[in-house]
Design a protein with these regions (language model features):
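Short, acidic loop-to-helix structural element flanking the phosphoryl-transfer center
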Residues: 2, 75-112, 151, 194
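Generic structural signal for small/hydrophobic residues in well-ordered secondary structure
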Residues: 6-9, 53, 113, 138, ...
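Acidic, Ser/Pro/Thr-rich low-complexity regulatory regions
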Residues: 25-32, 67-70, 104
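Metal-dependent phosphoesterase signature
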Residues: 46-94
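Generic enzyme active-site microenvironment
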Residues: 4, 114, 170-171
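Active-site neighborhood of HAD-like aspartate-dependent phosphohydrolases
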Residues: 1-42, 183, 207
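Alpha-helical elements of Rossmann-like donor-binding domains used by nucleotide-donor carbohydrate transfer enzymes
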Residues: 18-22, 45, 59, 63, ...
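Asp-based, Mg2+/Mn2+-dependent phosphohydrolase catalytic module
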Residues: 118-119, 123-208
Length: 208
């Protein structure tokens, strides 16, 4: 069985609304305003380009600052250090460790990741977190110039590691990404919590 993990909001904390509230308190003075500003920044084509590896950080900062009328220095400080905000989620890391331990007992079990992640953040996570060595492989979007939920990135992971779709479970917090994986014939589950994921793996596949 192949288990394919997303990173943001699955293995690592990702709270864009909180980021906006902390960095731009006047513009994001209410939860609603913070959510609106977060969507305007992180759901925009420019951020997707940064995720995809086709837009450089400085270009992203300049465009976003002008488009959303945000202080460029504050925005640069935010964007340059987002990798430091991506902290491991202990419960999910513990579940990953359980799967890593089980892997030695099951010859057909493999662990992979598939993450939309700008190149600077991807390299920082690789340097900081030894548990990423538990994975047998994976793909960061910025390294291959494709992003979820576009089918090409799923197909690339599948071909690179010879994944059998019916023996692959994809785990992501965003429904469009889950549906895209299912469109490739993979099993997929929308992540809510480590407990929910553990129960799903146990019930559907007999592990854990």
């Amino acid at each position: 069985m192949n288990f394919v993990f997303d990173f943001g909001a699955v293995l690592f904390t990702w709270k864009p609304v909180d980021l906006m509230a902390q960095c731009f308190p006047q513009r994001a003075a209410t939860p609603e305003a913070a959510a609106e500003l977060a969507h305007a920044m992180f759901a925009h084509a420019d951020w997707n380009g940064f995720d995809q590896g086709v837009l450089e950080m400085e270009v992203l900062i300049a465009r976003t600052s002008e488009r959303l009328d945000l202080d460029a220095l504050v925005l640069r400080e935010l964007v340059a250090h987002i990798d430091e905000r991506l902290q491991p989620i202990p419960a999910t890391v513990a579940l990953l460790e359980q799967l890593h331990t089980l892997r030695s007992q099951h010859a057909d079990m493999r662990l992979y990741y598939l993450s939309n992640m700008p190149r600077p953040y991807a390299r920082a996570l690789e340097r900081r977190h030894a548990f990423l060595q538990w994975f047998d492989g994976g793909i960061f979007s910025s390294d291959v110039l494709h992003i979820k939920p576009h089918p090409e990135i799923y197909q690339l992971l599948q071909s690179r590691y010879a994944l059998e779709p019916t023996h692959t479970l994809f785990i992501d917090d965003l429904l469009p990404n889950v549906l895209a994986a299912q469109g490739q014939g993979w099993h997929a589950v929308q992540f809510e919590s480590a407990g929910q994921l553990q129960a799903h793996i146990s019930a559907q596949f007999g592990y854990l």
